[in-house]
């Protein structure tokens, strides 16, 4: 598999000896460039642990991870600068928005590409284009404290997409949104995946969007199983 996300035999153990807990037990997973895949499972099944490993937030115990064309982990980290990886190669969309309180909406979204060296005008254009697509452009100059929960989430989604990273990890991105806006977010993710050859994993419990995925991974007790989805939202 060239590009995308490729996970082989990934494990994560917390603790030692009799008190050790195996959160991931040999996870295998593939997401092709240009593909959006759903990841579902009950609370405590290992979803968040898997995303944290993929996002280089925590270190796995063993296994192999490839993001894009780069092996980032093979029974140990294979890259030196994990902060640069998280900034430039991976887009994160969290259930809690975590917007910077002293920056307005546009600056919250434009900050990451500016830090990556994108000229200010281009970074702001990218930000406004995404804010428009997510129907929150009318709040471009508002401060985070002035936004509703749903508006904050849409701004956070724009921020996760603005750098056009090869990999996007989205954790419950549509939880606070109504059906129309939730499906709009999935359409935007799919459009971005196709346009920029982005590999996207969406962790969700949201029954509104589960039927949109063409492929779904179920995770339970740290083990993943793949199945075909309906894919209706991608037509």
Language model features: what each stretch is:
Residues 4-5, 10-219:
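ABC family nucleotide-binding domain
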